[in-house]
Structures are given as structure tokens and as C-alpha cells.
């Protein structure tokens, strides 16, 4: 890596591999053509092939837009998904869609009702996301295509269809890890070199309300974090050296609202010194996220911390000097060379999207790039 001097006069390295100094979590506001096409498909007025053609056109457009504004990383915006997690999880062997009595509770609102049910042995034999990634790979050009998928830990929240299906929790987590190990290999063979696991499960340990949810699901909030970490580490254990795997740790993101609050403190050591990943995307866009003290648990020099200091929930641009000041605060705990910048979450974790315009979305991403260029120049 070539050395450069940043605005504070410190020597930093130009980031040539993922995660990048200016990165983003992945999901983007669904375009009007995609929304209209999905509605027509649901109404029986459009075939699956016609819908895919429109998705392909719009994904190509947003990939070009990401490159045009200066990003080194591109995603498909999750344009083929309704949810950031359910669509992918339903494609695993042994998992089926399920409509519960009500949606997920967020701050002052609820999502539409949707969940998953585990009906048999978990496995990964084939998956529609493979074709989705291959399309992104083909159109990425000289940018790095990033695939975003839910963490295996999200399967913990799936209902069991019948008694007798995974009564043994150890077997359940073992099979989660093995299914994901196969998935990682399949995506690698398809050309993927930058994979992101999205995970809201950790936020349950940030506050008492979440820990009660864990207990209601039959888990122990004292021991479950270590089990979650082992599952992740087992899943990624055999990854090739040239595959970058990061994790985005999220507190919920639905129509500009949130589901959880609290800092990382209760599980900071497990997350920051216990996960064998290449990078962590951490939300830090408001007071609900806590302070930077947990970053003291970052012991590895090869772990990149992507600071989510730019909110994806609203269109107003942050004061760049305030963002730079916060990056410098984080650098008290972690070397500036190990830090990157991104929005705190995606712009549309579900197809409804957050409450900002597409132009505001692109302005936010340009803002990330401009600030990163100033800090790590």
C-alpha cells in the first residue's frame, strides 16, 4: 500500500482492498420501475422473466451510478429482495416462508408480517442468490462487487415447524455453520471476493428488553453470545485468503426507524476480539449507539473497523468537521489505518425503504467519499 499523509498530518495507507475507506452497507432505495414491476408481478400482471429483466436494467443503472460517484465497491442494492434477510434464508434447504400473527416491532411502528420456519435439516445445495451475484459480478467492471447476506445467527429466530426438529440446540448451530460454509464456498467459486454478513442478533444483548426476547426464545443471554461467535467462526473457518468477509452489526432499520438501542459494551469483547472476520461495520450515527470505549477490545492489527457515522435514515448531510472529529475520537482506541467510513446501515433494509429521496441517498454516499478522501488522503 502507498503511504499518504492525512489532514491531521498522520501517515496512513491508501486502502486498496475491502473494506474500503469509503464503503457502504449495501441496500439502496428501490427505484420506481422496480417497485412498479414487483407490484405487477404480485398481481399476476407480469411474469418472473419480465420482472427480472427490469431488475437487471435497474441494477445495471445503480451499479454505474455507484461507480460514477466514486465508490470502489458496488452492490446490487438488494433490488431483488423484499427483506434484507428473509429472502435469502428462505432459499436454504430446510427453511420455508412463514406468516406470523404480526410484524416486527420497531420504534412507533411495525413491519408487515413475515418470518421463516425451519422445516427440516439445514443445508445449502443450490440458491437463487448465486445467479443474482453472478449478474452483479459480470457488470461490476473495475469496481469490487460486494455480496450482502444475513448472518447464520439470524436462523436462531426461525420458528420450528414441528417438535423434534432441532431439539438439540448444539446440532442446530452446527448445521447453521455447515450450511453457510457451503454457501461461502459456492459464492467464492462464483467469483465473490467481498462478502458481508448482516446481523441484528447482537443488538439483543445491548439492552434489558433484548435480553428478555432472548429468554422468551429459549436462549440464555449470558451464554448465547459465545455460541453466536462460534457459529460465525465455524462458518468462515475455511475461507480462502483472498476472500474478505465482514459483518454489519445492526440495531434495525425500517422506514427510518429502529428496533434496538444501547452501546456495544455487554458483548464488545466477543464481537471485537472474538470474531474471525476481516472487518466490522459498526453503527455510530446517534446517541443510541453508545461511545467508542468498546473499541479498546480491538486487539488485531488486521481488523478493519468501518464507522457508521453517516445516517441513512434522513437526507440532511452531517457537518463534515463533526464527522472528522468523531473519527479522531475513535482513533484514540484503534489506529486510523484500521478505520473506514460508511453510512450506519443500508438505505432500504426492506423494500419500503427509508424516508429520503434517491438523490439524497447519492448525496449521502458522495458525502462519505468526500470525508474519507479528506481524512485518509
UniProtKB/Swiss-Prot annotation:
GO molecular function, one term: zinc ion binding
GO terms, biological process: methionine biosynthetic process
Domain of life where this protein originates: Bacteria
Residue ranges, compositional bias (Basic and acidic residues): 11-24
Protein name in the entry: Uncharacterized protein YxjH
Record-stated family: To B.subtilis YxjG.
Organism: Bacillus subtilis (strain 168)
Pfam family name, one: Meth_synt_2
Ranges for region Disordered: 1-25
InterPro entries xref list: Met_Synth_C/arc, UROD/MetE-like_sf
SUPFAM superfamilies in UniProt: UROD/MetE-like
UniProt xrefs under Gene3D superfamilies: 3.20.20.210
Amino acid at each position: 500500500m502507498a503511504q499518504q499523509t492525512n489532514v491531521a498530518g498522520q501517515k496512513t495507507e491508501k486502502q486498496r482492498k475491502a473494506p474500503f475507506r469509503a464503503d457502504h452497507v449495501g441496500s439502496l432505495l428501490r427505484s420506481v420501475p422496480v417497485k412498479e414491476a414487483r407490484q405487477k408481478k404480485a398481481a399476476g400482471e407480469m411474469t418472473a422473466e419480465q420482472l427480472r429483466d427490469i431488475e437487471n436494467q435497474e441494477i445495471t443503472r445503480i451499479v454505474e451510478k455507484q461507480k460514477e460517484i466514486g465508490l470502489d465497491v458496488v452492490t446490487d442494492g438488494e433490488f431483488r429482495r423484499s427483506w434484507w434477510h428473509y429472502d435469502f434464508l428462505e432459499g436454504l434447504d430446510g427453511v420455508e416462508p412463514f406468516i406470523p400473527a404480526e410484524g416486527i416491532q420497531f420504534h412507533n411502528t411495525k413491519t408487515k408480517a413475515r418470518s421463516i420456519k425451519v422445516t427440516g435439516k439445514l443445508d445449502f445445495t443450490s440458491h437463487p442468490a448465486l445467479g443474482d451475484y453472478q449478474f452483479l459480478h459480470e457488470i461490476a467492471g473495475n469496481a469490487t462487487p460486494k455480496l450482502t447476506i444475513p448472518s447464520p445467527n439470524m436462523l436462531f429466530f426461525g420458528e420450528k415447524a414441528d417438535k423434534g426438529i432441532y431439539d438439540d440446540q448444539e446440532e442446530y448451530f452446527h448445521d447453521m455453520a455447515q450450511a453457510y460454509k457451503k454457501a461461502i464456498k459456492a459464492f467464492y467459486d462464483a467469483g465473490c471476493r467481498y462478502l458481508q454478513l448482516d446481523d441484528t442478533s447482537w443488538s439483543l444483548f445491548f439492552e434489558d428488553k433484548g435480553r428478555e426476547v432472548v429468554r422468551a426464545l429459549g436462549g440464555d443471554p449470558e451464554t448465547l453470545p459465545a455460541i453466536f461467535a462460534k457459529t460465525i467462526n465455524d462458518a468462515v473457518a475455511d475461507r480462502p485468503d483472498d476472500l474478505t468477509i465482514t459483518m454489519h452489526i445492526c440495531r434495525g432499520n425500517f422506514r427510518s426507524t429502529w428496533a434496538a438501542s444501547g452501546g456495544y459494551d455487554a458483548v464488545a469483547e466477543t464481537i471485537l476480539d472474538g470474531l474471525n472476520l476481516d472487518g466490522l461495520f459498526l453503527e455510530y450515527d446517534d446517541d443510541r449507539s453508545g461511545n467508542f470505549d468498546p473499541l479498546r477490545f480491538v486487539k488485531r492489527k488486521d481488523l478493519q473497523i468501518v464507522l457508521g457515522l453517516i445516517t441513512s435514515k434522513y437526507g440532511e448531510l452531517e457537518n463534515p468537521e463533526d464527522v472528522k472529529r468523531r473519527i479522531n475520537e475513535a482513533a484514540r482506541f484503534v489506529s486510523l489505518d484500521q478505520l473506514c467510513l460508511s453510512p450506519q446501515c443500508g438505505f432500504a433494509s426492506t423494500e419500503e425503504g427509508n424516508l429520503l429521496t434517491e438523490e439524497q441517498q447519492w448525496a449521502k454516499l458522495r458525502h462519505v467519499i468526500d470525508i474519507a478522501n479528506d481524512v485518509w488522503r
